[in-house]
């Protein structure tokens, strides 16, 4: 065994019928961790149900159904390998909560794969004003997914089949759109594929011999390697807190930045509670250190379960510890609000693992969301499609950071009426020091 392959996360985006499931299913089927026996079972069921289109979407449908029924599917099923990377597919969208997941998402995508329906009418529907293609691309960019691969899918169903003219037309239109969003189209491979027939997915297709660029698999291998933020100070948002007999209090969460190790003195914001980490575990094995991306449980001394909650953030007490946000300024894009938003609006913010009502205290400016130029000072309101800078005040103690320093703690979804009405990235935070914070004996000894 040589060096372990690098892990990357990809998010597959695009309009509802663009063929995301088929394409993703195909990759997982050909390159992935799905057990041959499982595939055979699916194939047999598909045949019994006369699903000729079993092909690959069926694999994904089965996985989703099993996941939704609460059958824990081995997460390996959402993984596949390229020559260079282990790829994990982040929750395939089309899902109501996709936007929320993408933001508070358990993981930030390293690359977006945009699937485009190249058929007549299909492409136009996806890219139209209210098509999801635009929204997904805008979200990916706003949320810091800087690399993108575009797949012109369903090339087997263009008129004529495998039409170069149609491909050229789509590349031109999508490039101009992606450029407006903020991407550099010259750096984006546009791969003509058929997720259904398999053209250019893994091997080069003779049906598309006019195309000289990479296959989808090649394009995934050409993603530039992500830098993991282990050299930043520790930030670990808590997902849950358990009391484990014989061990004590065990907070659980994902290391977003920095490193967590036994013996470290950590501070939990917003309360400022400070204590020593006794041990760190992942998948029931103890670790000498946990890095960004690791989902860990760690045991802390002299702390009651009731003193810690989901949404609290653990940090190193000696290295830029996290603190409560008194208020913060964010760039917000309204994507799905039926009316208009003015000062005093108080929706719920989902940021990392916290879920807290926040007041839009002051709409500071309205900006052009593409260029960032100011359009209006102190606008009366913001409506769908608008972007602006807003000063926000949490209604309860909350921990957030600027997007530039700690990206996973600096992006959020604004939820109202059971849907995501806006997304935002935090530009600056005014912090406040905790008062009367408890420092445990274990932590005092380490001082």
UniProtKB/Swiss-Prot annotation:
Region feature G5, mapped onto this chain: 194-196
Pfam families associated with the record: GTP-eEF1A_C, GTP_EFTU, GTP_EFTU_D2
GO MF annotations in UniProt: GTP binding; GTPase activity; translation elongation factor activity
Keyword terms of this UniProt record: Cytoplasm, Elongation factor, GTP-binding, Methylation, Nucleotide-binding, Phosphoprotein, Protein biosynthesis
Matching CDD domains: EF1_alpha, EF1_alpha_II, EF1_alpha_III
Stored SUPFAM superfamilies: EF-Tu/eEF-1alpha/eIF2-gamma C-terminal domain, P-loop containing nucleoside triphosphate hydrolases, Translation proteins
G3: annotated segments: 91-94
Any GO BP annotation: translational elongation
GO CC annotations, alphabetized: cytoplasm
Segments forming domain tr-type G: 5-230
Region of interest (G4), residue spans: 153-156
Residues the record lists as binding GTP: 14-21, 91-95, 153-156
Annotated positions of the N6-methyllysine modification: 261
UniProt subcellular location: Cytoplasm
Chain positions found as N6,N6-dimethyllysine: 55
Keyword Endoplasmic reticulum found: no
In-chain residues carrying the UniProt-annotated modification N6,N6,N6-trimethyllysine: 79, 187, 306, 396
Residues that bear 5-glutamyl glycerylphosphorylethanolamine: 289, 362
Residues covered by region (G2): 70-74
Region feature G1, mapped onto this chain: 14-21
Keyword Nucleotide-binding: yes
Family membership: Belongs to the TRAFAC class translation factor GTPase superfamily. Classic translation factor GTPase family. EF-Tu/EF-1A subfamily.
Purpose: This protein promotes the GTP-dependent binding of aminoacyl-tRNA to the A-site of ribosomes during protein biosynthesis.
Protein known as: Elongation factor 1-alpha
